[in-house]
């Protein structure tokens, strides 16, 4: 149970200690995706949004910070990351959907892929 875990983490925290939680931003995500990947990513981000509400409810004094990273990657490297399922929303994607998705990425993007990757950091200080 997340409530129990947050309470335990908060109680175990030393004075001036911090809890940091990192996630992709849940809105306007710019990660290059194929259709099935986008669907899974949006589903995962909705779950994250619900978790953030629980975190906010349990940890009263939290702050939010966004970290923006300008990503430049070759399409070849990005496809390798997809094949290796480095992005968690790809873990449940079938091999067939992965192959079709890679074909979609090949058609959709240039040799160099550029996008803004934004991480949300939720921090709690004791």
Task: Show where each model-derived region lies.
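A short SAM/SAH-binding and catalytic strip from SAM-dependent methyltransferases
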Residues: 1-4, 25
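A short glycine-rich, Lys/Arg-flanked "PGG" loop and its adjoining helix->strand segment in the class I
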Residues: 3-15
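Phosphate/oxyanion-binding loops and surfaces in catalytic or ligand/nucleic-acid-binding neighborhoods
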Residues: 12, 58, 85
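Short conserved AdoMet
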Residues: 14, 56, 126
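Conserved class I S-adenosyl-L-methionine
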Residues: 18-48
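Short alpha-helix
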Residues: 44-59, 78, 100
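Conserved Class I S-adenosyl-L-methionine
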Residues: 62-126
């Amino acid at each position: 149970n997340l409530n129990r875990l947050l309470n335990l983490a908060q109680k175990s925290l030393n004075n001036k200690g911090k809890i940091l939680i990192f996630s992709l931003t849940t809105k306007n995500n710019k990660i290059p995706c194929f259709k099935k990947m986008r669907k899974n990513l949006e589903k995962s981000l909705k779950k994250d949004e619900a978790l953030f509400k629980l975190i906010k409810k349990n940890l009263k004094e939290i702050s939010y910070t966004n970290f923006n990273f300008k990503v430049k990657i070759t399409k070849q490297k990005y496809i390798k990351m997809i094949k290796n399922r480095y992005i968690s929303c790809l873990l449940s994607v079938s091999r067939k959907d992965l192959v079709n998705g890679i074909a979609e990425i090949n058609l959709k993007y240039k040799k160099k892929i550029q996008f803004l990757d934004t991480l949300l950091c939720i921090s709690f200080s004791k």
